[in-house]
């Protein structure tokens, strides 16, 4: 192990290398701490919303202790829903940074409520939150470049290259240097991530997959750095070329691909669905009540044999046209979700060629912060909203009195964290690309000449 101590001394003797490694360790630690702090803040928000909503419901119960048909309690009572962060969410914020993880809904039309909490600010969403995924995808390659760009040119400029190449087993020397430097970068990423995973209660399989993705991503960039560093250029030229490659692969090409996807697979924002549903609801006031009820009962025959509408206002008509408003945009909602999933599928395919995109998609999947996780939360909200509607419809359409005791019978939402293992194809593609580029770089390094 003397060679290891010797190579470590060489690295630590270089103030630039030592400072770079310490900086990466610090940045990763801050990113992990920031992610843990954010997920804890979200859990505290979720813990507060239930007692606050219970107090709100108690206020409604005092205001409407009894109702002849449950209309007023149905209209004024809110129900909290929440999407708790997974144990791995501290690693990658993903869509949790722009999509609500807490949403209160009523028995009224769902679509108008589902998207009114949507946040869309492209200037803020572009860079993303400073988390482990950000450090790995955008910053870690820069440290690989800093440690490997002068691997050969530095020895040439110092006049030692000819001597090193003349040594027996010289190829092993270069491989050891590359491996040690990459291992140190990996350690600066892995150590804070492991500590954060233990603090967050993350399972071992998920952590192992995250570390594998990090290792493969670093291997890709090590291969790229070697392909450039072995071309015989000066250190400055190597660094400039590698910085250009980094900008193209991590910033330019993903941005251009995103613009292309936006044009090829156009998808409206969720707020457009909200506006369409609200227009349908507002227009229902101009439609004869009997016509509205006929249309509603045709789609919900289980309420067909209930009492007819009285001549005065009745809440069941009001809730009926809210439900019809949701149904009027059902095709648009389906097209919206299908469009989002098509974009997601193309993004995953793009990750087969751009390792940064592929690694980020895998991390978001493990963390449960990607698009499928957000849509799964919306599905849970929709299923719960149907339970709430069905609960109140029993009072509204049967003219059954709603008393103080009935407030305790209300449905209760059960939140659960999202998160799943990524597809085998995504991990395999990243592995194949990383190992291919690394093998090409090591091959050139093994054929190094003065």
Task: Mark where each language-model region is.
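Membrane-helix interface segments
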Residues: 16, 170, 207, 235-238
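Residue-level signature of transmembrane alpha-helical entry/exit and packing/kink sites
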Residues: 2, 20, 134, 138, ...
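Secretory targeting signals
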Residues: 28-38, 123-131, 142, 176-235, ...
